[in-house]
């Protein structure tokens, strides 16, 4: 189980089981990953639009430097759940989801824990959320 920037453990299971969440995006990223940072404006827009409709993001950082990870989250205004165990690709979550490269993401339906979509980049995430949650 990875920790947030305050050092508190936050499990994906607890986020998926939270009754206010209908869909959770499990997002793997790192501050040093250029393509990951390109996704941030899309994630921010979709989070703002759909969070109150039951959408949550559980972001797992592959950073190994705590300060760089936290500073990037603050600078980019990534105000959703952020966790890291600061071990890079060696995190158990990466192994569980067979993540070989980033960015990588999985959209999980919380009612049954099923992955309903993967690799939703750019406008694709917003389009999928609109389909699932409405405008």
Give, region by region, the residue ranges found by the protein language model.
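A short beta-strand-turn-helix
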Residues: 2-24
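Extracytoplasmic/secreted envelope proteins and their assembly/folding machinery
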Residues: 13, 40, 44, 66, ...
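Hydrophobic beta-strand anchors of alpha/beta hydrolase catalytic cores
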Residues: 25-26, 57, 105
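Conserved redox-active cysteine motifs that mediate thiol-disulfide chemistry
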Residues: 28-45
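Short, solvent-exposed mixed-charge patches
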Residues: 29, 134-135
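Solvent-exposed loop/turn segments at secondary-structure junctions
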Residues: 30-34, 63-66, 88, 122
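Conserved segment of the thioredoxin-like fold in thiol-based oxidoreductases
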Residues: 48-102
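Thiol/disulfide oxidoreductase modules built on the thioredoxin-like
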Residues: 78, 85-134
């Amino acid at each position: 189980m990875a920790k947030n920037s305050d050092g508190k453990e936050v499990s994906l299971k607890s986020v998926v089981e939270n009754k206010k969440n209908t869909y959770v995006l499990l997002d793997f990223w790192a501050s040093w990953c250029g393509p990951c940072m390109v996704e941030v404006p899309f994630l921010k827009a979709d989070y703002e639009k759909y969070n109150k409709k039951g959408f949550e993001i559980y972001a797992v950082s592959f950073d190994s430097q705590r300060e760089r990870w936290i500073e990037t989250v603050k600078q980019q205004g990534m105000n959703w759940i952020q966790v890291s165990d600061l071990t890079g690709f060696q995190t158990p979550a990466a192994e569980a989801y067979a993540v070989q490269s980033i960015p990588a993401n999985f959209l999980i339906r919380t009612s049954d824990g099923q992955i309903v979509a993967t690799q939703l980049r750019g406008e694709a995430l917003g389009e999928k959320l609109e389909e699932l949650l409405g405008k």
